[in-house]
């Protein structure tokens, strides 16, 4: 439940790497405790078949969102090297989205500050959106003036709390890769400066069926049950 409150001392829901998985996104939103803001660290589209529905969710609710590498590719201006599975998801998204939706993806910022400057969003790394920054690499030097840096891209949930602030990856809503197939997200408490990583089960079989019906690669379906 997202409450209509703007307050720098608040609870904030953080999501990333939805990747067109509306079934998982719906499960996350149903599971999420009351928060006063929702933030997204990019890659709204790709891999799974509900690209338009996921774009419209974040767009209609004006969820602060940064551009992920799949978002950039679908918008048509990316040199990021994709494997065949990722490329198939990008092409499917390009076919499913209208020009206005693709333009919206292409206009997303690379970095964004929210919550009165207390939270900064970046997809892969603060200086390189294509760089993978795994939780083992989290260190205070990643932080600038913000209290919390939110990253995505790796699909691996994790966070570290330092004297200087917090670095957190909420994990992937739509395609987890940390061995847990449940959809991942996190809740930040900017009052206590704490992170609650959360997981929620969703109907993986229904998503697998939709992936196959869309003609996407089989591996995109099978990997969901393993969380890899």
What are these regions (language model features)?
Residues 1-10, 19:
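Haloarchaeal acidic low-complexity proteome signature biased toward cell-envelope/secretome components but also
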Residues 39, 64-66, 122, 150, ...:
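Hydrophobic/aromatic beta-strand patches that form the interior of the parallel beta-sheet core
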Residues 111-113, 121, 159, 185-187:
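Conserved hydrophobic/aromatic beta-strand scaffold that supports enzyme active sites
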């Amino acid at each position: 439940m997202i409450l209509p409150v703007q307050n720098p001392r608040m609870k904030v829901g953080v999501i990333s790497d939805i990747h067109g998985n509306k079934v998982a996104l719906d499960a996350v939103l149903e599971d999420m405790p009351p928060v006063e803001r929702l933030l997204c660290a990019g890659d709204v589209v790709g891999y799974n078949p509900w690209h338009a529905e996921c774009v419209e969710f974040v767009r209609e609710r004006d969820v602060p969102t940064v551009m992920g590498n799949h978002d950039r590719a679908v918008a048509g201006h990316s040199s990021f090297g994709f494997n065949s599975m990722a490329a198939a998801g990008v092409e499917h998204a390009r076919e499913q989205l209208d020009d206005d939706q693709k333009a919206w993806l292409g206009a997303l910022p690379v970095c964004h500050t929210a919550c009165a400057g207390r939270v900064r969003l970046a997809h892969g790394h603060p200086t390189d959106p294509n760089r993978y920054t795994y939780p083992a690499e989290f260190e205070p030097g990643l932080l600038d003036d913000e209290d919390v840096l939110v990253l995505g891209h790796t699909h691996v949930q994790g966070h570290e709390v330092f004297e200087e602030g917090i670095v957190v990856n909420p994990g992937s809503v739509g395609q987890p890769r940390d061995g847990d197939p449940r959809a991942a997200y996190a809740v930040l408490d900017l009052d206590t400066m704490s992170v609650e990583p959360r997981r929620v089960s969703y109907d993986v079989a229904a998503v697998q069926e939709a992936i196959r019906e869309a003609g996407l690669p089989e591996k995109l379906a099978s990997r969901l049950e393993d969380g890899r």
